[in-house]
Amino acid sequence: VGSEMCIRDSAGAIFGGSAWVSTSAYFIGMAAIIISGIMLKKTKMFAGDPAPFVMELPAYHWPTLGNVLRSMWERGWSFIKKAGTIILLSTIFVWFTTYFGWVDGTFRMLDESEIDSSILAAIGGAICWIFKPLGWGSWQATVASITGLVAKENIVGTLGILYGGGDGTVYQNIAQAFTGITGYSFLVFNLLCAPCFAAIGAIKREMNNGKWTAIAIGYMCLVAYCASLVVYQIGGLITGEVGFNIFTIVAVAIIVFTIYMLVRPNKYLNDNEVKIDVKKVAASK
C-alpha cells in the first residue's frame, strides 16, 4: 500500500498523472526479482542443486459477498490502525522536527523561510551527500526516504509537510523540486530499497537469523541504489540533464556487470552436477 501511494503521488506531482509510471514500477519490481534470482544463483554462496517445490493449489471458486466484505473490512481496519498509530506519530515527529530548530542560538518554532535551520534539515543535510549521485541529494528527499523505513506511506506525508502541504500547492512545489529523471530515480530507489520496519520484522521471523536478515536488507538497499544510479546517470545523459562524469562510468559498469552475470554459465551448478555423477558411478560399482 505504501509503495502504491508513493508511486501514485509521484505520478501525479511530477509526471502529470501518467499511467505508465505505475505500470513501469510494477515491471521494474518484477525484473529486479528475476534478475536477482538469476545472478545470485550463479554465486558460490547461493549455488546448489535445484530443490523441488510442490504447492497444493486450492479449488478456485467465485468469492461470496460475505467473504469479500470481511476481507475488505480486515484490510481496511488494519490500515486505519496503522494510519492512526505509526503513521500519525511519525508524521507528528516529522512536523515537529521540521518547524523547530535553533536560530541565532535560540531553540524556537520556525517560520516557513527558516525551515533550512530545522532539526530535520540538520539530520538530512548530514547524509544527503550519499544520494547526490542519484539526482535527489536534497535534505527533504533524503529524510522522506528515511521516514519510509517506518512505513512507506510516510514518504508521501513527509513530502507533503516539507513541500507546503498546508497551502494546497504541494504538487507544484514537488514538481519544481524534481525533474522527470530525478523524480523517477527517487521512485525507483524507494520502490526497491528496504521495506518498512514491520516487513523487516517479518523477514527476521521467517529467516530466524539476524545475520541473513541484515544481508537481505543490505542487498535490497544496494540493488535500489544501483538501479536508481543507472536511471539518473544514463537517463540524464540521454536527456542532457547530466554531463559525463565518474558516476556515469559507474552506472555503465553496473549495466555491464549485470549483463555478464546473466549470460555467464553457472560454473557452480556444473561442479555440483559432476559431483553427483561421480557419486552415482561410485554407488553403481
Regions found by a protein language model. Give the residues of each.
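Membrane-interface capping segments at transmembrane-helix boundaries
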Residues: 42-43, 260-276
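Extended, low-charge hydrophobic alpha-helical regions
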Residues: 92-222
